[in-house]
Design a protein with these regions (language model features):
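Terminal amphipathic alpha-helical/low-complexity segments used for targeting or macromolecular assembly
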Residues: 1-35, 40-41, 46-47, 83, ...
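Structural signal for interior beta-strand "rungs" in well-ordered beta-sheet cores
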Residues: 31-211, 216
Length: 284
């Protein structure tokens, strides 16, 4: 990547004009490689670097302080927040792999400080939801795929080769191990850790570990919750809640009633109950 910027610096040394985006004539911090193609209808922020052979289509917005690598394609109606990094050969906002898609106007939105590594694909939404959303401070490792209409919260990590079907929802701070496959319309709760190589075909409630085939509850994500600053009392309450739901032998309704009566009031208790009750695909 450094050599790309050397090409621009070299051209300046030869007294030729640096390649600057309109509106940044007095700000040489925004550098666009001569081989990159940027539509005039795109909006590019300050201190942005755009690498060789990358393409930015119309109606794209790239926030300040972003670095876009070489051979990246950012398709129409995509918004990328500030401080993001997109590594080489990634495709952001391409049309969905959905046979029902009829070129309706939909979009892709990515928050601030999110990192998208090599060969990642993110598809735009369909008319069902209209948008694919990725939050702030996320990390999408190499060769991951985010399908149409997915919604990812903040601080989500998708490890190498993990794949989301359409309409998947992932809560804040969730982590998917390498090669995880998530079935369309599945919901992954906040602070969940799914072990590498497994499939999620049913909803995974917040704060837990999931592994095995088929995916099963493996306990509370204690290490993750410690790192996020959950107190001993909060972690104990979450463990007691799931002990009733998964280990008591009660059916779903009876387990939820027992949780409501036996577990002290807590936003985490309410979050678990609301997630389970709203599940449409069933709980692992």
């Amino acid at each position: 990547m450094a050599s790309a910027w050397l090409i621009i610096l070299w051209s300046q040394k030869q007294n030729s004009q640096p390649i600057l985006w309109p509106g940044h004539e007095n700000n040489i911090s925004t550098l666009i490689h001569p081989t990159a193609v940027v539509d005039p209808a795109a909006v590019v922020g300050t201190n942005v670097k755009l690498g060789p052979y990358s393409i930015v289509e119309a109606n794209v917005t790239i926030g300040d302080d972003c670095t876009i690598g070489n051979h990246v394609t950012i398709c129409s109606n995509t918004t990328i927040g500030q401080g993001c990094r997109v590594f080489h050969s990634s495709s952001i906002g391409e049309i969905p792999q959905d046979l029902k898609f009829e070129r309706e106007k939909t979009k892709t939105t990515i928050g601030d400080r999110t990192t998208i590594r090599e060969y990642v694909t993110v598809n735009r939404g369909t008319k069902a939801h209209g948008e694919t959303q990725i939050g702030s401070d996320c990390l999408l490792m190499a060769s991951t795929h985010v399908a149409h209409d997915c919604i990812l919260g903040d601080n989500v990590i998708m490890s190498n080769l993990s794949t989301l079907g359409g309409h998947v929802t992932i809560g804040d701070w969730a982590v998917l191990g390498g090669g995880v496959l998530v079935h369309q319309f599945t919901k992954i709760g906040a602070h969940v850790f799914v072990g590498g190589g497994f499939r999620a075909v049913q909803d995974v409630p917040p704060f837990i570990l999931g592994a095995e085939e088929p995916l099963k509850f493996q306990g509370v994500n204690t290490i993750g919750l410690k790192r996020r600053g959950f107190s001993v009392e909060e972690r104990k309450l979450i463990k007691n809640t799931y002990r009733i739901y998964f280990r008591s032998g009660l059916n779903r309704q009876d387990a939820l009633h027992k949780i409501e009566s036996d577990i002290p009031m807590s936003p985490y208790k309410n979050q678990i109950i609301d997630f389970i009750r709203s599940s449409e695909r069933g709980i692992i």
